[in-house]
Amino acid sequence: MIFDFPKKFRFADSHEYACPEGDLVRIGISAFAVDQLGDIVFVDLPGIGTLLEQGISFGSVESVKAVEDMNAPIGGEVLQINESVLNSPEELQNDPHGEGWLLLVKPSDASQLDKLMSSEIYSEKVSSK
């Protein structure tokens, strides 16, 4: 399957993305990860004000196949969570790079974005799977 990953996104090895938006970063999971999970039935996210640490679990996503931890692609403070994904997990499945975003974060160190893969490199990585 061919995936179209937005150019401004940066990706972690564990398939979470970070999308810079001014001084903030929107976090979600990639369309590839969503495709691998299958039908998503539940999403667990941290509360507003939670401090995330890069590479450390911040929540989980449950599908009919598995329960997977989600790791923070960047550290920072959670300013907003996507309530609609909590109420309707299929939004994550239908539009993971758009309406299915998970968190809006104020990064503690924006240079952590440089440690993530570009959309081009990530695309090459997942297309070989």
Swiss-Prot record:
Modified residues (N6-lipoyllysine): 65
Cited Gene3D superfamilies: 2.40.50.100
Required cofactor names: (R)-lipoate
The species this protein was found in: Prochlorococcus marinus (strain SARG / CCMP1375 / SS120)
Membership in a protein family: Belongs to the GcvH family.
Listed GO biological process terms: glycine decarboxylation via glycine cleavage system
Underlying gene: gcvH
Protein role: The glycine cleavage system catalyzes the degradation of glycine. The H protein shuttles the methylamine group of glycine from the P protein to the T protein.
Organism domain of life: Bacteria
Descriptive protein name: Glycine cleavage system H protein
Keyword Signal in record: no
Subunit-structure text: The glycine cleavage system is composed of four proteins: P, T, L and H.
One term under GO cellular component: glycine cleavage complex
